[in-house]
Amino acid sequence: MLVDSHCHLEYEGLVDEQEAVLDRARGLGVRAFLNISTKQAEWAQVVGTAQKTADVYASVGIHPHHADEHSELERADLLAAAKGGKVIGIGETGLDYYYDHSDREAQKHLFRLHIDVARELQLPVIIHTRDAEDDTLAILEDEMGKGAFPALIHCFTASADFGQQVLDLGLSISISGIVTFKNARDLQEFAKAIPQDRLLVETDSPFLAPVPHRGKTCEPGFVHDTATFLADLRGESLDSLAEYTTRNFYALFSKAVP
């Protein structure tokens, strides 16, 4: 049994046939789904889906793309939302300097705000980082110095050096379908070396469909293809990888019920 640790069930391509999408995934052995929010306007819908669906959980947070739109976000609002039923994580949040859709200082401010709430509640921070390794690491190191908090780098595509540094800080790493792409050699090499107790798998659906589904809308069930590829890459059985990545999910997102 697998868990899709990061999907966007309210996004176009999935929301209109949400139940069918989930049923297809269940048929492939996916036992739980973490439905991720990216802006405050989504929180109610994301949490609502989790509340009405036994095997779906929710996160609340602001994607760095939307930082400028949330300059007035109050800590109390994020804290209250994060205390909601079936909310098991904070995010996704972080830094994206590739697109720079929002001011970098605004991104940093919200990243720290998310961490502060996560530290208080001891819920994992779900981190997006792209072309921002130095600042991401600097913030993580600084914030860890104020008190520990659980955290995950989602859809990991960064350098091996960055990966090792976040592992040294105690973070977990989630691998998406990008690892199946033929040009993802560096990611494939790093994915071989991630310790078993720090590895999770995800789809980031409806984006980033893995081989052999490239060009299609990604679905949570495609985590099976990513896990199959990853198990072969690491010289492990699919059953073994599924068992420990699922165990890792419930250990990290400890508010979820296995």
List the predicted regions and their residue ranges:
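Mid-domain alpha/beta scaffold segments of enzyme catalytic cores
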Residues: 1-258
